[in-house]
């Protein structure tokens, strides 16, 4: 009789927490006297690390910068962390889980922190649109593949 692989896929959220939080309004109070037509820039970054067997930490960093002309109205950064149990998932499925699925879970928490910080800074309400982490992850994979292809071509020319 042959032995079958009975590894079941399992996913569980162990904890979601705010790892780091920062809010700066470097040009207050002068910025409050200007017309509020900001340019808002959103930067996202994710990182993951293995804590134990089948246990991973995923950190989503969200940075929002609002500028009025050359002046920064506010800069807000939140690092939203999560600890996830992920069993029976390997390779590209694991990479997708940690690079897209987990950030999708963390983003609403980070968005709420940012909204609260901006409000406490007495700036107009900031509503961050949902982010398609699946598309961002696929774009990342495509860039990685193109980088590897370019690297191979360069090595062949050398």
Curated annotation (Swiss-Prot):
GO terms, molecular function: unfolded protein binding
GO (cellular component) term, any one: cytoplasm
Disulfide feature: none
SUPFAM superfamilies: SecB-like
Entry-linked InterPro entries: SecB, SecB-like_sf
One Pfam short name: SecB
Main location: cytoplasm
An example Gene Ontology biological process: protein folding
Keyword Protein transport: yes
Protein name: Protein-export protein SecB
Annotated organism of origin: Yersinia pestis
